[in-house]
């Protein structure tokens, strides 16, 4: 279970995964891959966070978005890409990769994993870093139309 925290004191910890891992017969929480938009598309944008992907897909006229739970949450990503039959993956990860070395390292590892998939063309979508996420950037474009 993933819960959004609205704690101004910990702005860097927006979401928490809940589990019963420490309880008798408990289980850990598992990250999952969220897919939104036109699943017939041969191009998929890859980003972090299901809500961000839903918003970005809507703002990009139903573009296909594959959304991981976090930059280190890669379980199931390659299988999802293969299962959708996409030919192109466009990285749309948050711009904090430019300033946070830990995020950058995780994004590079993710990129290497996706690039191992045969037949996939991989590119990176870039925008003005004043907009942290692809959803923020697309919303700014929609607001000026």
Regions found by a protein language model. Name each.
Residues 64, 88, 121:
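Residues at the starts of beta-strands that form the adenosine-phosphate
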Residues 136-145:
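Short, small/acidic-rich helices and loops at N termini and domain boundaries
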Residues 123-132:
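Acidic carboxylate-rich catalytic motifs and surrounding loops in phosphoryl-/glycosyl-chemistry enzymes
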Residues 101-117:
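Short, aromatic/basic amphipathic alpha-helical patches
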Residues 46, 87-102, 125-126:
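Acidic beta-strand-to-loop metal/phosphate-binding motif
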Residues 1-85:
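Phosphate-handling DNA/RNA-contact segment within nucleic-acid enzymes
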Residues 52, 73, 106, 110, ...:
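Short phosphate-engaging motifs
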């Amino acid at each position: 279970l993933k819960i959004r925290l609205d704690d101004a004191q910990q702005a860097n910890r927006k979401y928490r995964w809940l589990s019963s891992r420490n309880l008798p017969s408990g289980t850990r929480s598992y990250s999952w891959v969220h897919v939104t938009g036109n699943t017939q598309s041969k191009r998929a944008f890859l980003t972090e966070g299901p809500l961000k992907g839903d918003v970005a897909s809507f703002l990009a006229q139903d573009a296909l978005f594959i959304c991981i739970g976090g930059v280190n949450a890669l379980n199931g990503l390659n299988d999802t890409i293969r299962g959708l039959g996409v030919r192109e993956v466009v990285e749309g990860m948050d711009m904090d990769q430019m300033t946070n070395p830990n995020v950058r390292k995780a994004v590079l590892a993710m990129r290497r994993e996706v690039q191992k998939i045969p037949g996939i063309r991989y590119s990176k979508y870039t925008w003005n870093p004043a907009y942290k996420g692809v959803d923020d950037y697309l919303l700014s474009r929609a607001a000026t139309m």
